[in-house]
Amino acid sequence: RNLYIIMKSKQEKLANLFVQDVPKFGWSRDTLLQCAKKQRISTSVLAKLFPSFEYDVLKFIIAQNNNKVEKNYNSFNNSRLKTRDKIKTIMELKFENNNHLKKALPEMLKFLLRPGNIFMSIKMLHENSDFIWNLSGDKSNDFSYYSKRGLLSTIYLATLIYWLNDKSEKDIATKNFISKSVDGIVDGVSKFKQLNVLRSLAQNFFSRFNESKT
């Protein structure tokens, strides 16, 4: 038990330092190795903390976020909320709990969009949508199980890109975007239209990101 607590503490400290350094040095193994060096963590210990290095750091951060979101969501009476309001609330909590990652997210997205990481990215996006639907109490096990998660994955990715460009106070614009997007899923807005929104947001994000690099 004590060893687990020590390992968990080291993981958290290293992941936090990594996130701080990512905007400057990128989401990479080299960045993680440099962070470990700063904290006097040997490569052998690092391999125990994060066996797949920068990939496992990402999984660790996602798991942390999900734990916080679940705890916050279950801290109030959510049983009377409609399904769409449950989804909206959970998504808002996810972005609120990710606020400290905002500066690192452009590099994280570049990492996830590498050709060799695409399948992993799709899997993570599906798992994220699955987490949100399950926490909302979704019990579907038919075709709608996949269509719901597919649509929510599109919405989550679109919201992520929108959020990165959001300069509004307390991210109110992102919350409005979440509300309209989730209503779109529930009210049957076509997947084609959702994909067009995502494409437009992605083009806007990457054009801004490239401008900031020049």
List PLM regions with ranges.
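Short, Lys/Arg-enriched N-terminal segments with co-localized hydrophobic residues
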Residues: 1-6
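Short, amphipathic alpha-helix enriched in basic
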Residues: 8-43, 52-59, 63
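Conserved phosphoryl-transfer catalytic core
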Residues: 64-75
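Hydrophobic alpha-helical connector segments
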Residues: 73-107
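Amphipathic alpha-helical packing segments from all-alpha helical-bundle domains
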Residues: 116-138, 149-153, 157
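Hydrophobic/aromatic-rich alpha-helical bundle segments in the mid-to-C-terminal region
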Residues: 138-197
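Long, charge-rich low-complexity segments
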Residues: 191-214
